[in-house]
From Swiss-Prot:
Pfam families: HSP20. The gene is hspG5. It comes from the Eukaryota. The lineage of its organism: Eukaryota, Amoebozoa, Evosea, Eumycetozoa, Dictyostelia. InterPro entries: A-crystallin/Hsp20_dom, HSP20-like_chaperone, HspG1-11-like. Residues 96-138 are annotated as: Disordered. This is Small heat shock protein hspG5. Belongs to the small heat shock protein (HSP20) family. Induction: Down-regulated by Pseudomonas aeruginosa, PAO1 strain and PA14 strain infection.
Length: 202
């Protein structure tokens, strides 16, 4: 029979790097690319199980939590926030692409193009080159210079095996709280529990 120390030792993931390797191997089998494995603290008190996971910079709308086959899974996506200049570039790109599509729809027929090709070819090339130069200048002005880039973005996932303590927990009492980048999951323990089920003979 496992002691309380054994249970806590398993839950707290003391060997963090080995746990990361195990989770990465599971993710590979599911063909899911995981960019972030968030750190976690697990505490068992006399009346509850407390799971704290650091998810700084992540919106609660991008977090999913579920329990399946005694495995608690916390997953989601940490998206990169765009500043005003980057948002403006995205808008300009979308506007340029839509303008290009409109211009293609309004293209002249072959006959009209052949009649006007000689007098308009030089001015058209010059105008196009000028527009491209202006766009390059605007992009250069709007682009930011990054000196340090250490933050991680992308998909995150963390598993917690509850097999050894699941019989003690009241899953109907699960409570979650997300504040200041810290996700706290609290599960109350049952008032009366046992890891042994007595079977009567009829």
């Amino acid at each position: 029979m496992a002691t309380l120390f054994d249970i806590l030792n398993t839950l707290n993931n003391n060997n963090y790097f080995e746990n990361c390797k195990r989770q990465c191997s599971i993710n590979k089998s599911n063909k899911t690319i995981i960019d972030i494995i968030p750190p976690m603290d697990v505490t068992m008190t006399n009346d509850k199980l407390i799971i704290e996971t650091e998810l700084a910079g992540i919106s609660k709308d991008h977090i999913e939590i579920d329990i399946k086959d005694s495995i608690l899974t916390i997953q989601g996506e940490k998206k990169k926030n765009l500043n005003k200049q980057q948002q403006q570039l995205v808008i300009e790109k979308s506007t340029t692409s839509s303008t290009t599509l409109d211009s293609k729809e309004d293209e002249a027929s072959i006959e009209e193009f052949e009649d006007d090709i000689k007098p308009k070819s030089k001015s058209t090339v010059t105008t196009t080159a000028t527009k491209e130069n202006k766009e390059d200048e605007n992009k250069t002005k709007l682009s930011d210079k990054k000196f340090i880039s250490e933050r991680s973005f992308g998909n995150f996932k963390r598993y917690l095996d509850l097999t050894k303590v699941l019989y003690q927990l009241d899953l109907n009492s699960i409570n979650t709280q997300f504040e200041n980048g810290l996700l706290t999951i609290t599960i109350n323990k049952k008032l009366h529990y046992s890891n042994t089920i007595k079977i009567n003979i009829n």
